[in-house]
Amino acid sequence: MIRDIGQSRVLFLDSGPLVRLLQMHPDFYPAVSGILDMAYEKNVQVLVSSVTLFEISSRAFENGEGVLARQYREFFEKSKNVCCCEVDAEVSVKAAELFAAASRTNHKITEAESLRLATAFVNGADCILTECANFRSLSDALVVTLDEV
């Protein structure tokens, strides 16, 4: 599956894999770190949603680590291959469409997940690294879950 990710030109990094990386989770850190190393080596554009920045920064502030939250922002804004994508009107409407489509199936997603998936869609991601297998039924992009890497 990592080989498939290596074919990507625009990789969307969802919240779950990023959180596992920051936690240095023993089961997932090596895989996520390896994927990011490969992305830098192959000059793959890595997208993250501003929703993800909100989610990880919230945790930092809850733990009294405001400096860490600002470091996350700095990383997203200054990293060469990483782009923090805003939730604008187009992303919001696409998220509403995805959320409604998912609610009509057994592949439910949360509002935050729909915003993140819409961010990937609107910004042209051809691969999504996530923990949410339900993204597969809602996206034409290659969806790779952490369990698969």
Each model region followed by its residue ranges:
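Short, hinge-like loop/turn segments at secondary-structure boundaries
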Residues: 63-67, 102-103, 144-148
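Acidic, PIN/NYN-like endoribonuclease modules and their adjacent C-terminal/linker elements
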Residues: 1-10, 38, 82, 117-149
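Active-site neighborhoods of divalent-metal-dependent phosphate/nucleic-acid chemistry enzymes
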Residues: 2, 82-127
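Conserved glycosyltransferase catalytic-site signature
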Residues: 15, 50, 89, 111-114, ...
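Short, well-structured N-terminal submotif of metal-dependent ribonuclease cores
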Residues: 1-48, 61-74, 133
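General small-molecule cofactor/ligand-binding pocket signal
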Residues: 47, 85, 144
